[in-house]
């Protein structure tokens, strides 16, 4: 039976909680075995998805709170990460996963669901590929292809500071208040034993992928890539990312299917909350913005 390399890095710096698994992806791309890794950041910080505008993070609030900001190579928005989150990453050669992104994501998240369940959390993978208990997301995940490797990252959230998570987003106050309200409903921590979760994840991924879990470590090539990644992730150019035009309307995703969308014109603002494909609530400071908000929602494809 081929190996599933298991690497548990334990507690690491905020920077390394990102660069280590990127290094593993380059290693697997170059021929290292499929790898399941674990780590926990030693301090809070903010992660930014690969394709997102840096302006989506409130950099002044991050500086004031002493939170570093790192751009990662998987998608998603601005996320608050801290020492109360157990990170896990599964990395496979691209040839070993289904071609369809949807199918690949389900295949690589289902063992995580099994691990949550084994640790005592009644988790399910819903139709939006969110790991949930009821309507609440319990695991933030992201996915990417890095060279010839596919990586899916996720977290076991033992405690979650919804207010701190909303504070790092660049939002008008009324939008921030709505995001906190939605996070409290739709993002839930699962305070279970992280060691039990890790053991269950190792067993579940080994079984699902037909691989034999074997303790491992970084290869020389991965150590080399790690040094390079540490430098890249610290560079202002990498953090700034590609220049993208500001969107006509702004939106924050709380979980799949739950968004706050808003537009601003000449100091006036219209805000809508979307749950499923229904508009849950709307606040418009000027009736003239109604049409613009409706058009923005249609354009964002959040409401049919």
At which residue positions do the language-model features occur?
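Long, positively charged amphipathic alpha-helical accessory segments at protein N-termini or as interdomain linkers
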Residues: 23, 31, 106-122, 137-139, ...
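Structural motif
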Residues: 133-134, 265
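Internal helical hairpin/lid segments
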Residues: 237-281
């Amino acid at each position: 039976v081929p190996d599933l390399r298991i690497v548990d890095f334990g507690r690491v710096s905020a920077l390394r909680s990102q660069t280590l698994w990127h290094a593993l992806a380059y290693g697997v791309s170059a021929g290292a075995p499929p790898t399941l890794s674990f780590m926990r950041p030693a301090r809070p910080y903010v992660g930014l998805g690969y394709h997102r505008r840096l302006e989506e993070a409130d950099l002044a609030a991050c500086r004031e709170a002493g939170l570093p900001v790192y751009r990662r190579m998987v998608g998603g928005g601005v996320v608050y990460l801290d020492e109360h989150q157990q990170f896990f990453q599964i990395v496979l050669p691209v040839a070993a996963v289904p071609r369809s992104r949807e199918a690949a994501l389900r295949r690589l998240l289902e063992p995580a669901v099994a691990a949550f369940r084994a640790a005592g959390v009644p988790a399910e993978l819903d139709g939006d590929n969110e790991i949930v208990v009821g309507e609440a997301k319990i695991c933030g995940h992201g996915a990417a292809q890095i060279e010839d490797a596919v990586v899916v990252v996720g977290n076991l959230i033992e405690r979650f500071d919804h207010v701190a998570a909303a504070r790092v987003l660049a939002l008008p106050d009324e939008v921030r208040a709505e995001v906190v309200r939605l996070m409290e409903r739709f993002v839930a921590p699962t305070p279970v034993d992280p060691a039990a979760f890790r053991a269950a994840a190792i067993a579940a991924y080994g079984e699902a992928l037909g691989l034999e879990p074997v303790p491992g470590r970084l290869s020389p090539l991965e150590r080399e890539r790690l040094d390079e990644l540490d430098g890249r992730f610290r560079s202002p150019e990498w953090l700034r990312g590609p220049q993208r035009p500001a969107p006509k309307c702004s939106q924050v995703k709380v979980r799949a299917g739950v968004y706050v969308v808003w537009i601003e014109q000449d100091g006036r603002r219209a805000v809508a909350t979307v749950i499923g494909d229904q508009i849950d609530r709307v606040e418009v400071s000027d009736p003239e913005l109604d049409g613009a908000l409706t058009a923005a929602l249609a354009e964002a494809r959040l409401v049919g």
